[in-house]
Regions:
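Binuclear metal-dependent phosphoesterase catalytic core
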Residues: 3, 7, 86-89, 106-107, ...
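Residue-level detector of beta-strand structural context in well-folded domains
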Residues: 54-55, 101, 126
Length: 150
């Protein structure tokens, strides 16, 4: 994740769980960048300390629905994830859990982004660009793309 932050130089970082401590470490290493995060199913201790499994915030002027995804059963279907994101007025539904990168736009304009995993499973991150409160692009950067940016 550190390499991705150095390569992309984002205005904000979203960490979608498992290994909640990694998000806290990134926040300490890059104190000038706002880090938003949710715990994953492997962060059960964090959930017991009342860290919400779902958050919906305005990040860089864009309302984002953020969850790890295990409680939305994203390995089976995205239906519940999309329904909840729409109900909260989000412009994007961000999730993890599957470790499979996914970036697409629904017919109604809702962006859906799973960054994959930037850790030991190969390396990918999601990049979302915003302007004036709108998402202008979203994509997955895989490890070779990140290497080119360094």
């Amino acid at each position: 994740m550190r390499r991705a932050v150095n390569a992309v130089k984002p205005q904000a970082i979203v960490h979608l769980g498992d290994h909640f401590d990694d998000g806290e470490t990134v926040a300490q290493e890059f104190p000038h960048i706002r880090v938003h995060q949710v715990p994953g199913n492997c962060d059960a201790w964090r959930m017991m300390r009342y860290e919400p499994a779902v958050k919906c915030y305005d990040v860089c002027g864009v309302r984002l629905f953020m969850t790890h995804g295990h409680e939305h059963h994203v390995k089976q279907t995205l239906m519940r994830l999309l329904q909840d994101a729409r109900a909260m007025g989000a412009k994007a539904a961000l999730y993890g859990h599957t470790h499979l990168a996914d970036c697409h736009r629904e017919e109604d304009g809702l962006w859906v982004l799973n960054p994959g995993a930037c850790g030991s499973t190969g390396g990918s991150v999601g990049l979302m660009e915003t302007e004036k409160g709108e998402i202008i692009s979203a994509r997955i950067l895989k490890n070779p793309d990140l290497e080119e940016m360094l």
